[in-house]
Amino acid sequence: MKKISKRLESIKAAHTIKKVASTTREEDYLEVIAELVELKGYATTLDISRFMNVSPPSVTKMLQKLDEKKYLEYEKYHGINLTNMGKQVADTIRRKHSILLEFFEILNVGQGIANQDTEGLEHHLNPKTIRQLRKYITFLKSNPKIIKQFHEFSRK
């Protein structure tokens, strides 16, 4: 697997640093699976373990749990398919992830901090907060002088 998305790299980096709660962890698995499927057409236990920084048996255990909750269909050695419900959760998290990462990039906090904070916050923000943050980013980008002024101000 030569091409790796920025989102997968940021997930991997965040999971190198800290452990997260169960529901947050489930969302991260769904996010990684969706990203892998989009990138290469499928997701394997080994791929997931690499990006989540966990052992393949841990991935198998989580896949079984997500299968029981109807987020995906999993049969050992036969593949992983997200259900519509799993796709919805993954898509929601992926949208939040993109918006937060873009915001932290505007704040100019550095990629490492942006990745870590995005992974920490994406699971906990209200949808309205995300919508407003998207509007704010759009506003800032339509007024690049404000971003430039902020960057100059924050260097002081």
What name fits each language-model region?
Residues 32, 62-65, 71, 85, ...:
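Residue-level recognition of specific faces of alpha-helices
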Residues 15-18, 84-89, 102-103:
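A ubiquitous short alpha-helical element
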Residues 2, 122-156:
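C-terminal regulatory/oligomerization modules of transcriptional regulators
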Residues 78-96:
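Basic, amphipathic "hinge/linker" alpha-helix immediately C-terminal to the N-terminal HTH DNA-binding motif
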Residues 1-23, 155-156:
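N-terminal leader segment of winged-helix/HTH proteins
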Residues 94-132, 136:
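Arg/Lys-rich, alpha-helical DNA-contact motif
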Residues 45-80:
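Canonical helix-turn-helix DNA-binding module
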Residues 16-54:
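N-terminal helix-turn-helix DNA-binding core of bacterial DNA-binding proteins
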